[in-house]
């Protein structure tokens, strides 16, 4: 991808959904946008007003007739001259329009995320807002949408910029003490006040990092694993939760040999539920592999549902894992004893207990996520840089035996780490990673 600041090409791409569709939107950005209008529409429409025009190839043939909007620089998404062409969403129409645009000098198809990258390069957004937009596009549940909107609205940027300014101000006091210690207008030692302020900032960042775990769960989803002996009803429960036949149900033991996963939306929280191979001793090589995978998935789970057939002999055994485990008695319609052993009793034949279990799963997910604050770290990149910030702050606070010059340098490094989160300093090496997450038309 082009280096920041060297965007001389005009880029274009289909920014709407898959074809065919009712309407297709082609987006354009760059210095040749006005030339594109003059060539294809023989006119430049009034800025920010929809105009109904005929779009033509260079030889004058009509391609389509539709709406177009012109957004002159710098007041556009990318900060460059931008345009949108709204066409009928037929494949032939869109392909012809893209082909005509590609023939124009200085115009080329956009790379993934290039519109957003240009917006970043032109100061229209910082990296956290760009990441929030990527999450908003990828959001599949209401909770994910709300979290992405908080980030895309700039809440993170405001918080990190405020913290960075506090570090810069604190460093300025230390350097003033170094440079003007003999001047009368510099208070006596301000160091103690600075270290107290940095200690308070450190605690704020630590609390902020702790909230990131919940945000990560909301962004990436909670993981629930169903385990139990063969024929305990694991696949039947998965099919109920999925609302469709995902797993094969059979009286033959060992039918499920690999992991089967479905995604649920429980109160706006994404929850991934995995059915696993029945846990038992077996000589089957394939089944052993399935059991090993089941145990590996259990180790990564947020919650394990351990199922046992209530109608048979009671032999409840729970695998030793860190995740919270619920004992679920199945086939409740067939009766059984020792009902106090199980947290829930269910029957996929009659539906008994299933809605109660589903409600409990949603309550578990909501309790795990909790109340998401206005600004939370949503990427591991953020958390790593925040931890690096804390490390430098700690060095500054605890360096009583160090010269003030070195402690001021720790403060400078801390502010740099915060600046890397928003993209204010030294982030070129991660830009390709971030913007490659977008689709071509964004």
From Swiss-Prot:
Gene Ontology terms, MF aspect: GTP binding; GTPase activity; metal ion binding
Binding residues for GTP: 231-236, 250-256, 275-278
Enzyme class label: hydrolase
Domain TrmE-type G, first and last residues per copy: 221-366
UniProt subcellular location: Cytoplasm
Keyword tRNA processing found: yes
Keyword set includes Magnesium: yes
Domain of life the protein comes from: Bacteria
Enzyme Commission number(s) of this protein: 3.6.-.-
Binding locations of (6S)-5-formyl-5,6,7,8-tetrahydrofolate: 27, 84, 124, 442
Keyword terms of this UniProt record: Cytoplasm, GTP-binding, Hydrolase, Magnesium, Metal-binding, Nucleotide-binding, Potassium, tRNA processing
Residues involved in Mg(2+) binding: 235, 256
Record's GO cellular component terms: cytoplasm
CDD domains, A to Z: trmE, TrmE_N
BP-aspect Gene Ontology terms: tRNA methylation; tRNA wobble uridine modification
Free-text comment on the cofactor: Binds 1 potassium ion per subunit.
Cofactor: K(+)
Job of this protein: Exhibits a very high intrinsic GTPase hydrolysis rate. Involved in the addition of a carboxymethylaminomethyl (cmnm) group at the wobble position (U34) of certain tRNAs, forming tRNA-cmnm(5)s(2)U34.
NCBIfam families given in the database record: mnmE_trmE_thdF, PRK05291.1-3, small_GTP
Assembly: Homodimer. Heterotetramer of two MnmE and two MnmG subunits.
HAMAP family reported in the protein's UniProt record: GTPase_MnmE
Family indicated by similarity: Belongs to the TRAFAC class TrmE-Era-EngA-EngB-Septin-like GTPase superfamily. TrmE GTPase family.
Stated name of the protein: tRNA modification GTPase MnmE
Source organism per UniProt: Brucella suis biovar 1 (strain 1330)
Record lineage: Bacteria, Pseudomonadati, Pseudomonadota, Alphaproteobacteria, Hyphomicrobiales
């Amino acid at each position: 991808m082009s280096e920041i600041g060297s965007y001389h090409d005009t880029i274009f791409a289909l920014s709407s959904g898959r074809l065919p569709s009712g309407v297709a939107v082609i987006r354009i950005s760059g210095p040749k946008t006005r030339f594109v209008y003059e060539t294809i529409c023989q006119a430049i429409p009034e800025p920010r007003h929809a105009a109904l025009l005929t779009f033509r190839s260079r030889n004058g043939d009509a391609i389509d007739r539709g709406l177009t909007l012109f957004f002159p620089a710098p007041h556009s998404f990318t900060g460059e001259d931008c345009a949108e062409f709204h066409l009928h969403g037929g494949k032939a129409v869109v392909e012809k329009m893209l082909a005509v645009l590609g023939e124009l000098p200085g115009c080329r198809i956009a790379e993934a995320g290039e519109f957003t990258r240009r917006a970043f390069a032109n100061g229209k957004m910082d990296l956290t807002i760009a990441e929030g937009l990527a999450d908003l596009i990828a959001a599949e549940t209401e909770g994910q949408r709300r979290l992405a909107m908080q980030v895309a609205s700039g809440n993170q940027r405001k918080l990190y910029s405020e913290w960075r300014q506090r570090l810069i101000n604190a460093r300025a006091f230390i350097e003033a003490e170094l440079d003007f210690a003999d001047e009368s207008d510099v208070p006596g030692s301000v160091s103690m006040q600075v270290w107290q302020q940095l200690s308070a900032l450190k605690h704020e960042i630590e609390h902020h990092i702790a909230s990131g775990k919940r945000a990560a769960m909301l962004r990436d989803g909670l993981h629930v694993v169903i385990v139990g002996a063969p024929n305990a009803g694991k696949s039947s429960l998965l099919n109920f939760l999925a609302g469709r036949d995902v797993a094969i149900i059979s009286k033959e033991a060992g039918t499920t040999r690999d992991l089967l996963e479905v995604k649920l939306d429980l109160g706006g929280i994404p929850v991934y539920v995995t059915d696993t191979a029945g846990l038992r001793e077996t000589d089957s090589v394939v089944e052993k592999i399935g059991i090993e995978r089941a145990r590996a998935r259990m180790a990564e789970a947020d919650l394990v549902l351990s199922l046992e057939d209530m109608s048979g002999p009671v032999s409840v055994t729970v695998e030793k894992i860190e995740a919270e485990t619920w004992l679920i008695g199945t086939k409740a319609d067939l009766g059984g004893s020792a009902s106090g052993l199980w947290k829930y009793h269910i029957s996929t034949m009659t539906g008994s207990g299933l809605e109660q279990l589903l409600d409990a799963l949603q309550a578990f997910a909501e309790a795990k996520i909790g109340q998401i604050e206005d600004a939370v770290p949503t990427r591991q990149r953020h958390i790593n840089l925040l931890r690096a910030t804390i490390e430098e702050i700690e060095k500054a606070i605890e360096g009583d035996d160090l010269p003030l010059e070195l402690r001021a340098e720790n403060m400078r490094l801390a502010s740099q780490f915060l600046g890397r989160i928003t993209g204010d300093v030294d982030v070129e090496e991660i830009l390709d990673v971030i913007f490659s997450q977008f689709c071509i038309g964004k």
